[in-house]
UniProtKB/Swiss-Prot annotation:
The keyword Signal applies. InterPro entries: Prot_inh_I78. Residues 1-16 form the signal peptide. The keyword Signal applies. Keywords: Signal. This is Uncharacterized protein C23D3.17.
Length: 78
């Protein structure tokens, strides 16, 4: 499986994966590691550990999963 592809979504490149390891919220210790607003897709949500989320599927929505510090650990669509 090619990690730059998103199976089940027309096999289109999944560019948001390049944001893994960056911070979705401002990081005063390393501002360069913070995601710029221009890098974010039109439709997205941030899923922090133990947070609740809706189960509706939106094929164009990007889900940024973070650790407790707001660092992106992985990215999914839906």
């Amino acid at each position: 499986m090619n990690p730059s592809r998103n199976p089940g979504h027309g096999d289109k490149p999944f560019e948001e994966r390049k944001l893994v390891g960056k911070y979705i919220f401002p990081n005063k210790d390393d501002p360069r590691a913070t995601v710029e607003e221009s890098e974010l897709p039109k439709s997205y949500r941030v899923l922090q550990p133990n947070s609740f989320c809706t189960r509706d599927f939106m094929p164009d929505r990007v889900n940024f999963h973070t650790d407790s510090n707001g660092k992106i650990t992985h990215v999914t669509k839906g």
